[in-house]
Curated annotation (Swiss-Prot):
Catalytic activity field: ATP + H2O = ADP + phosphate + H(+)
Broad class of the protein's primary localization: mitochondrion
Source organism of this protein record: Canis lupus familiaris
Gene3D superfamilies xrefs: 3.30.30.30, 3.30.420.40, Actin, Chain A, domain 4, Substrate Binding Domain Of DNAk, Chain A, domain 1
Protein name from the UniProt record: Stress-70 protein, mitochondrial
UniProt free text on domains: The N-terminal nucleotide binding domain (NBD) is responsible for binding and hydrolyzing ATP. The C-terminal substrate-binding domain (SBD) binds to the client/substrate proteins. The two domains are allosterically coupled so that, when ATP is bound to the NBD, the SBD binds relatively weakly to clients. When ADP is bound in the NBD, a conformational change enhances the affinity of the SBD for client proteins.
Pfam families documented for this protein: HSP70
Length: 649
């Protein structure tokens, strides 16, 4: 927690103060810190003493995920089992109960759209009634349902899964990738989240890590991680902007780098703006044009829509390097007149016109971030692009117009975040030194006060009059309900309710003059801790804000068990597959040799071996297949030894 580490931070930042005034600048404000000064601190002095083994850095993305580890002083991005450096954040469940993750899941999405989940990061930590969730329900082929706790979950084959569970399945794939490379178990991880994620979304991401079997040491902001990847080996002091337009979210962060000190000056963004929206906009355009030309409405055909969705994503990517592309989908659907084919040419200019409003939505957050950081575009020495959508030329031009300089391409937009997470893991393990990370909270924190007003704890006076005071008739005591919210709206009801707690034991005569001191801390994961203390009586109560409407401890434990069950099933499947491959190789070699020497082998032995071979091809378990293959191999060796002695020896 920051409160527990301020002394250590002061020592570190004090040393940095000689390097420049802004590296250690804290604005005067309540409790000595302003909203912008709630810091997340990390350096060797703050490294955990208990960390043993490698710490993997994971970018759990909306569209794709990536994992990296530190090798000495350099971060290395790891390839998955399919040989790719990024893994689609897609999870599917087949009709026979098999779970697929990554590219195997994405490949079968056309034939199984209702049970293939993608972009579920947009649902993580969200309530079913959220406007963004209601919008998503209309755009995806799979079912989004209301869970018993009011959260948005997904459904496949009658079973419900939380977005944290789906994220956990992807994290398990990342964990497996790391373990295959390291050669041993990977337990500790740093996971990234969008900078504009609220407390519930951060908690839900940590839940996903726990379900996957990872010990999540830290949750850090994606733009901050990208800045670490960019600036670790840079000696020049400068202010940079990180423009992060990924698959599902948009973040903009302004940072100052001074001799190893990475200070986030401000952050802003939109947690429901990304490549998925670009795909959806193009999909709507294609469906509209197809209906105009053929009279057929594709919106009721999930399989056809999935084909169009994949074609839209492919066309979007191609138009980043080409000025025109063709979209060809034969036999897309059919009506009474026969099959219908989709053939369409799409130019870059047409696509830019379709998504221009989405690109413009990134401008206001950038302007607000510069305003909050108290910098102008002339102060910014470098603009870093992160996220696959920043490959789009129109996005790059918008960034150049906005900041007055061509954006840098010094980092890989798909890998920078995972690299930064691995660097942060190295910091926590004590392997990376001379790095100090100072981050900010993305949204204001406060409480509900009289009239339902949202009172910002970081900018207002620390003494508040609570909205509700309850009296108990039995003993004349009172209890005070305190609601903690997060957001930027003026009324508490319009912001996110993080949690509530009660301060009890306040004498009745003091109610009218009751004033509470409400200090709060934000730990290194951006998770909120609040306490309330009555100035008159000294009564105090504390709360660690848990995900409002999120997963309970029992929920998480059950999901961990389910994840372990899937892991065991995956292990058995891997053993069976290996055994089948081995057996098929032995069968092929044996049959080839027996065919070659059948005239020189006893007929009854040839028939016996053939019968055994055919029978054992149908063995179901890996162990049975292995034993059958071994028996066949031994019998064949004896037979060919006999042949060698008789005809060769």
């Amino acid at each position: 927690m920051i409160s527990a580490s301020r002394a250590a931070a002061a020592r570190l930042v004090g040393a940095a103060a000689s390097r420049g005034p802004t590296a250690a600048r804290h604005k005067d404000g309540w409790n000595g810190l302003s909203h912008e000064a709630f810091r997340i601190v990390s350096r060797r002095d703050y490294a955990s003493e208990a960390i043993k083994g490698a710490v993997v850095g994971i970018d759990l993305g909306t569209t794709n995920s990536c994992v990296a580890v530190m090798e000495g002083k350099q971060a290395k991005v790891l390839e998955n089992a399919e040989g790719a450096r990024t893994t689609p954040s897609v999870v599917a469940f087949t009709s026979d109960g098999e779970r697929l993750v990554g590219m195997p899941a994405k490949r079968q999405a056309v034939t199984n759209p209702n049970n293939t989940f993608y972009a579920t990061k947009r649902l993580i930590g969200r309530r079913y009634d959220d406007p963004e969730v209601q919008k998503d329900i209309k755009n995806v082929p799979f079912k989004i349902v209301r869970a018993s706790n009011g959260d948005a979950w997904v459904e496949a084959h009658g079973k419900l899964y939380s977005p944290s569970q789906i994220g956990a399945f992807v994290l398990m794939k990342m964990k497996e990738t790391a373990e295959n490379y390291l050669g041993h178990t990977a337990k500790n991880a740093v996971i990234t989240v969008p900078a504009y994620f609220n407390d519930s979304q951060r908690q839900a991401t940590k839940d996903a890590g726990q379900i996957s079997g990872l010990n999540v040491l830290r949750v850090i902001n994606e733009p901050t991680a990208a800045a670490l990847a960019y600036g670790l080996d840079k000696s020049e002091d400068k202010i940079i902007a990180v423009y992060d337009l990924g698959g599902g979210t948009f973040d903009i962060s302004i940072l100052e780098i001074q001799k190893g000190v990475f200070e986030v000056k401000s952050t802003n963004g939109d947690t429901f703006l990304g490549g998925e929206d670009f795909d959806q906009a193009l999909l709507r355009h294609i469906v509209k044009e197809f209906k105009r030309e053929t009279g057929v409405d594709l919106t009721k055909d999930n399989m056809a829509l999935q084909r169009v969705r994949e074609a839209a994503e492919k066309a979007k990517c191609e138009l980043s390097s080409s000025v025109q592309t063709d979209i060809n989908l034969p036999y897309l659907t059919m009506d009474a007149s026969g099959p219908k084919h989709l053939n369409m040419k799409l130019t870059r200019a047409q696509f830019e016109g379709i998504v221009t409003d989405l690109i413009r939505r990134t401008i206001a957050p950038c302007q607000k971030a510069m305003q909050d950081a108290e910098v102008s575009k002339s102060d910014i020495g470098e603009v870093i692009l992160v996220g696959g959508m920043t490959r789009m030329p129109k996005v790059q031009q918008t960034v150049q117009d906005l900041f007055g300089r061509a954006p840098s391409k010094a980092v890989n937009p798909d890998e920078a975040v995972a690299i930064g997470a691995a660097i942060q893991g190295g910091v926590l393990a004590g392997d990376v030194t001379d790095v100090l990370l100072l981050d900010v909270t993305p949204l204001s924190l406060g409480i509900e006060t009289l009239g339902g007003v949202f009172t910002n704890l970081s900018t207002e006076t620390p003494l508040f009059q609570p909205r509700k005071v309850f009296s108990t008739a039995a003993d004349g005591q009172t209890q005070v309900e305190i609601k903690v919210c997060q957001g930027e709206r003026e009324m508490a009801g319009d912001n996110k309710l993080l949690g509530q707690f009660t301060l009890i034991g306040i004498p009745q005569p003091l109610v009218e003059s009751l004033r509470l001191k409400l200090p709060f801390d934000i730990d290194a994961n951006g998770i909120v801790h609040v306490s309330a203390k009555d100035k008159g009586t000294g009564r105090e109560q504390q709360i660690v804000i848990q995900s409002s409407g999120g997963l309970s401890k029992d929920d998480i434990e059950n999901m961990v068990k389910n994840a372990e069950k899937y892991a065991e099933e995956d292990r058995r499947k891997k053993v069976t597959t290996f055994s089948v491959n081995m057996a098929e190789g032995i069968i092929h070699d044996t049959e080839t040799k027996m065919e070659e020497f059948k005239d020189q082998l006893p007929a009854e032995e040839v028939n016996f071996q053939n019968e055994g071979t055919l029978a054992r091809k149908d063995s179901e378990t890996g162990e049975n297949i292995r034993q059958a293959a071994s028996s066949l191999q031994q019998a064949s060796l004896k037979l060919f030894e006999w042949h060698t002695k008789r005809y060769v020896g």
